[in-house]
Amino acid sequence: DIDRKDLREAADYFGNYLQFHRLKHRLAQSSRTLQKTPVPIAEYTFSDTKEHFAADDVRTLMLAEGDSGLVGDLLKKRPADLLVCDLPYGVQHAPQNGKKAESFPKLLERILPAWRRALKPGGAAAISFNTLTLRKDTLLTLLQNAGFTLLTEPPYDDFSHFVEQAVHRDFIVARNEQP
């Protein structure tokens, strides 16, 4: 995400969730510089029990603020099992370098290869989006062109639902089968 407020709210929400459910966890906040751009990171390490946490039987959730096209570099040494994305519902997508805003399909064409590189082989990207601003067939084609394997059979084929007047949400899961 590029909105620092959204990153902080998501990190706070997840921290509150972990506390409410009494899950052992640790928050590490840091920043990395990628292509001369600072990328603030909030990383939660958590487990279901103190014993599992002590034995390093943990899961990690990383929230990062910045250009999504840098995620391949960000996760180069520790690729992810899962990338989760709720695409914007129709706003301008201006790059941080001050250049002209990219069209949404052009933005995705640029960043999807980085998402695939950020995933372990067998890892998946789970993407929700507004079908009124981005057609499902367009997103499927962009994902396929970026080297993803599309999961289109049940139970992955019927997530489409009405949210409100300007939002009709759908959901796609795509796997990285490449090493």
Segments from the language model and where they lie:
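Class I S-adenosyl-L-methionine-dependent methyltransferase catalytic core
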Residues: D1-P179
